Curated annotation (Swiss-Prot):
Zn(2+) 1 binds at residues 78, 141, 198. Cleaves the N-terminal amino acid of tripeptides. One of its GO terms (molecular function) is zinc ion binding. It is found in: Cytoplasm. Its EC number is 3.4.11.4. It catalyses: Release of the N-terminal residue from a tripeptide. PANTHER family: PEPTIDASE T. GO terms for biological process: peptide catabolic process; proteolysis. Its cofactor is Zn(2+). The active site is at 80, 175 (proton acceptor). Keywords: Aminopeptidase, Cytoplasm, Hydrolase, Metal-binding, Metalloprotease, Protease, Zinc. GO terms for cellular component: cytosol. This is Peptidase T.
Length: 408
């Protein structure tokens, strides 16, 4: 089995789930344990300036082996896995020569990965896949990216005749909870530009993403005994429901695709006395993004007039922006990635990211950073899987990008 696979199988067995609301950085101790493992591995490979900082960021350098000036390229992946599903006690399963039919992930629990539900599986008939055992996520997002970067770097270190400029690599914590770039030192990293290796199926190349905001809403009610509540009770649950129904019903994740934005209600907790709503707001276009946020403000203002001042408190905060605005100033990094894919036999699929990456924020911090595929599918859940050949191609693409810049 390829080295990239061996690495990946090893990495996913480390529990690195990030945790919302943690008071530590990184948010979980497991990420630091994994980071220390990566530091040891990078040192064994002979990289320079291998460093783990107090916030859990791993950085290292491959020195240039060419005499002429070439740009310093960075490759970045994140160590944490999504809190949407357990990442503890991951038991990857290898499915060789996939037959195009149902894959039984867990016989005792009757958990099946089926092409009826995931038709893209059919494309991998005859290929080797890595799946979960149905009880956890897999962690290809983004331990596949880490395995692919380190395998590419190992090739550079073991083949000194392979031309390359200075290469910087970084592995970040807490990307899945939106904090992956919070403590990232762009100046310390020292790259002219970078690529995150955090995308999905083979061929994905992304340099557009959502503009993103989060809206945390508190609805304050008045609770009295229901038998004597007339003209006194103010039920925060009903007001919260009214607020939800004032948003466009079709503009939710289940009804949108491509470049369409949405409002997404992530959680509701409450009682008559008080209800809390947690929304995310997403749109690719800045003007529409602002319109969505303004609608939230107007709804809150309206309900405060209707039910009384301070019935609604709205905490609206931008999270990240569409990196296209920054990438387009350095579009050669996208064109070079496209060419690299084509030269190693991968068809580029340039699509907008209906989400965000560390690269989105890093691009606004002065480090333009589009996103490359890992090869994985169905991230964040029990049906996550990754084809082995896609991982191998991801390594090839990384190496080809490096070569193209070194030989221009």
């Amino acid at each position: 089995m390829a080295k990239v696979v061996d690495r990946f199988i090893s990495y996913v067995k480390y529990s690195t789930t990030s945790k919302e609301g943690s008071e530590t950085f990184p948010s979980t101790e497991g990420q630091l344990k994994f980071a220390r493992l990566l530091v040891d591995e990078l040192k064994e490979l002979g990289l320079n300036n291998v460093h783990l900082d107090e916030y859990g960021y791993v950085m290292a350098t491959v020195p240039s082996n060419v005499d002429h000036k070439v740009p310093t390229i960075g490759f970045i992946a994140h160590m944490d896995t999504s809190p949407d599903m357990s990442g503890t006690n991951v038991k990857p399963q290898i499915v060789e020569n996939y037959n195009g039919k149902d894959i039984v992930l867990n016989k005792s629990k009757n958990i099946i990965l089926s092409p009826d539900n995931f038709p893209e599986l059919k494309k991998y008939t005859g290929k080797t896949l890595i799946t979960t055992d149905g009880t956890t996520l897999l962690g290809a997002d983004d331990k596949a990216g880490i395995a692919e970067i380190i395998t590419a770097v190992e090739h550079l270190m073991n083949n000194p005749e392979y031309p390359h400029g200075e290469i910087k690599i970084a592995f970040t914590p807490d990307e899945e909870i939106g904090q992956g770039a919070d403590k990232f030192r762009v100046d310390k990293f020292g790259a002219d530009f970078a690529y995150t290796v955090d995308g999905g199926p083979i061929g994905e190349l992304e340099y557009e993403n959502f503009n993103a905001a989060r809206a945390k809403i508190t609805v304050n009610g008045v609770n009295v005994h229901p038998g004597t509540a007339k003209n006194k009770m103010k039920n925060s649950l009903l007001i919260a429901n009214e607020l939800i129904n004032m948003l466009p019903p079709a503009e939710i994740p289940a009804h949108t695709e491509g470049y369409e934005g949405f409002f997404h209600l992530m959680s509701v907790t409450g009682s008559v006395e008080q209800t809390r709503l947690d929304f995310i707001i997403r749109d690719f276009y800045k003007n529409k993004f602002e319109e969505r946020k303004n609608l939230m403000v107007k709804i809150a203002d309206y309900l405060n007039v209707k039910y009384g001042e301070n019935t609604i408190t709205l905490n609206l905060k931008d999270q990240y922006y569409n990196m296209k605005e920054k990438i387009k100033e350095h579009i050669h990094i996208v064109y070079t990635a496209r060419r690299a894919m084509e030269e190693v036999g991968v068809t580029p699929r340039v699509n907008p990211i209906r989400g965000g990456t560390d690269g989105a924020r890093l691009s606004y911090m002065g480090l333009p950073t589009p996103n490359l595929f890992t090869g994985g599918h169905n991230f964040h859940g029990r049906y996550e899987y990754i084809p082995v050949f896609a991982m191998e191609k991801a390594v090839d693409v990384i190496l080809k990008i490096i070569e193209l810049y070194a030989t221009k």
